[in-house]
Amino acid sequence: MPNSTLFFITLCLSRVLVTFFFWMAGIYGVFHFAEIVQEMVTVGLPWPVLFAAGTIFCQLAGSALIVFNPAGYGWIGSGMLIVFTLLTIPLGHAFWAFSEPRRTEVFHIALEHITVVGGLIMSALFAGYRR
């Protein structure tokens, strides 16, 4: 790995960018908790308040672990967000349950989630990088 200031700055910036959506969603959830609970009700999850709190915790704690990478444990945050993101596909973006043209629209959202997972895998791999 190159040991340069530019590489380190780029790595830090990439950690912020790969978690940006999760930060925004988590912060939004803190201030609009009832809406997040209603989302859990809509997808049919039991204990919607617990799942809403868990969702917000996962988004914020996972993001913080990636960005701050304490003692090289950012990979745990990556793993949290990978599992969370993959679970949102069958729970919130089940494209196979729709007919066209909605099926294609939701399928594209699922593909975007897969792409985010790829970025999170890279963040897990770089979690051990030390300047």
Residue ranges and their predicted role:
Residues M1-H32, V49-A61, F68-R131:
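Extended, low-polarity transmembrane helix blocks
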Residues R15, A34-W47:
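Short juxtamembrane and helix-loop transition motifs at transmembrane-helix boundaries
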